[in-house]
């Protein structure tokens, strides 16, 4: 990819600055929130137990607080996911990344998959991103899952958790075709490089979930303004 094509993309507003290392302490949350505010990322994504702290850190800021629900397997009950979602919203989350129940999808329990997402969308009244774990779905299952999540009211389809491999360009292209622009596409898992992130956006993604956002911004700044000062290196890494 050329330098010109990289710098044509406004990267920061597409990024969910993800902190999903279970060993990440509160200091990391504060750091991630400060970075997200500084660079105007779309959101900071943290575990539910750290939503309240992230909300305090980003009070009055434009960056949203996102969290994961039923993560990473989706193999909890619909009522448990709903409780987790509503508690997260009470603590300040304004975006929810919700893992669907893969077993239910694969054994044809489409009503259960639909209802679980629909209830969270209706009762939480915040942006819901449904995680599909695309790498373990057949083409027919993927198409079915997309339609169920659109009908349920989700605002985004998210490619996966990272527990079953990373996102691919081909998957994002498939989702672009399947969604027909009716819903956003969040590409996540294994996105560590600026060029790959830009390629995913070009393929149809509208959000990028990554914990490597600062490294990407350094690459972006170097491509756009080679002689200008880059984001600082003195940061903790998870």
What name fits each language-model region?
Residues 55, 76-87, 137-148, 173-177, ...:
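Catalytic cores of alpha/beta
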Residues 1-34, 173-185, 191-238:
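Alpha/beta catalytic cores of nucleotide-metabolism and tRNA/nucleoside-modifying enzymes
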Residues 48, 52-73, 110-136, 166-193, ...:
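Alpha-helix-loop-beta-strand connector modules within alpha/beta enzyme cores
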Residues 29, 33, 51-52, 85-86, ...:
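Generic structural signal for well-ordered alpha-helices
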Residues 67-72, 90-105, 151-168, 187-225:
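Glycine-rich phosphate-binding active-site loops on the catalytic face of alpha/beta enzymes
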Residues 40-42, 61-65, 92-94, 124-128, ...:
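Short, well-ordered coil/turn segments that N-cap beta-strands
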Residues 33, 37-53, 69-73, 96-114, ...:
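Glycine-rich, proline-tolerant flexible connector loops at the mouths of alpha/beta enzymes
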Residues 1-91, 144, 148:
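Conserved N-terminal beta1-alpha1 strand-loop-helix module at the mouth
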């Amino acid at each position: 990819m050329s330098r010109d094509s990289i710098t044509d993309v406004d990267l920061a507003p597409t990024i969910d600055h993800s902190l999903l290392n279970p060993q990440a302490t509160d200091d990391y949350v504060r750091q991630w929130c400060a970075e997200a505010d500084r660079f105007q990322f779309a959101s900071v994504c943290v575990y539910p137990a750290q939503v309240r702290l992230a909300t305090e850190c980003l009070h009055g800021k434009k960056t949203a607080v996102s969290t994961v629900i039923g993560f990473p397997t989706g193999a909890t009950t619909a009522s448990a996911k709903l409780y987790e979602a509503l508690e997260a919203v009470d603590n300040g989350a304004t975006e929810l990344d919700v893992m669907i129940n893969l077993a239910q999808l694969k054994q044809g329990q489409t009503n259960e998959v639909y209802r679980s997402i629909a209830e969270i969308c209706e009762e939480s009244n915040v942006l819901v991103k449904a995680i599909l774990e695309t790498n373990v779905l057949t083409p027919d299952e993927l198409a079915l899952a997309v339609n169920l999540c659109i009908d349920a009211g989700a605002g985004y389809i998210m490619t996966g958790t990272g527990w079953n491999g990373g996102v691919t360009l081909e998957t994002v292209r498939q989702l672009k075709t399947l969604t027909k622009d009716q819903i956003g596409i969040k590409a996540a898992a294994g996105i560590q490089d600026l060029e790959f992130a830009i390629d995913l956006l070009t393929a149809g993604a509208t959000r990028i979930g990554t914990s490597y956002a600062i490294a990407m911004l350094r690459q972006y700044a170097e491509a756009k303004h080679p002689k200008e000062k880059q984001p600082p290196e003195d940061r903790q890494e998870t």
